[in-house]
Amino acid sequence: MAKAGGITNAVNVGIAVQADWENREFISHISLNVRRLFEFLVQFESTTKSKLASLNEKLDLLERRLEMLEVQVSTATANPSLFAT
């Protein structure tokens, strides 16, 4: 009977080792995917900041042009004789 108990114990250890291996593999996959997600988010943030900065510069330029046009229109409205040909 001692032999049967030893085999059962060995089988239980084998099952436990297999389960532990599967758990470690699962955790490894989760860790890798979390790392990939983090790297993507860092890259996304960097790209987004760069694009937003570029758009902000373009918007500032457009705002300055609009202000200049508003001044020209108000000047033309106030003094139409300046633009008469």
Curated annotation (Swiss-Prot):
Protein species of origin: Arabidopsis thaliana (Mouse-ear cress)
Name of this protein: Protein BRICK 1
Function: Involved in regulation of actin and microtubule organization. Part of a WAVE complex that activates the Arp2/3 complex.
GO-annotated cellular components: cell periphery; cytoskeleton; plasma membrane; SCAR complex
Principal cellular location given in the protein's record: cytoplasm
Tissue: Expressed in roots, root hairs, hypocotyls, cotyledons, stems, leaves, trichomes, and flowers.
GO-annotated biological processes: actin filament polymerization; actin nucleation; cell morphogenesis; trichome morphogenesis
Keywords: Coiled coil, Cytoplasm, Cytoskeleton
Organism superkingdom: Eukaryota
Cysteines paired by S-S bonds: none
Quaternary structure and partners: Binds SCAR1 and/or SCAR2 and/or SCAR3.
Compartments reported by the entry: Cytoplasm, Cytoskeleton
Family as reported in the entry's similarity comment: Belongs to the BRK1 family.
GO molecular function: identical protein binding; protein-containing complex binding
Residue ranges the record marks as coiled coil: 45-79
Entry-linked InterPro entries: BRICK1
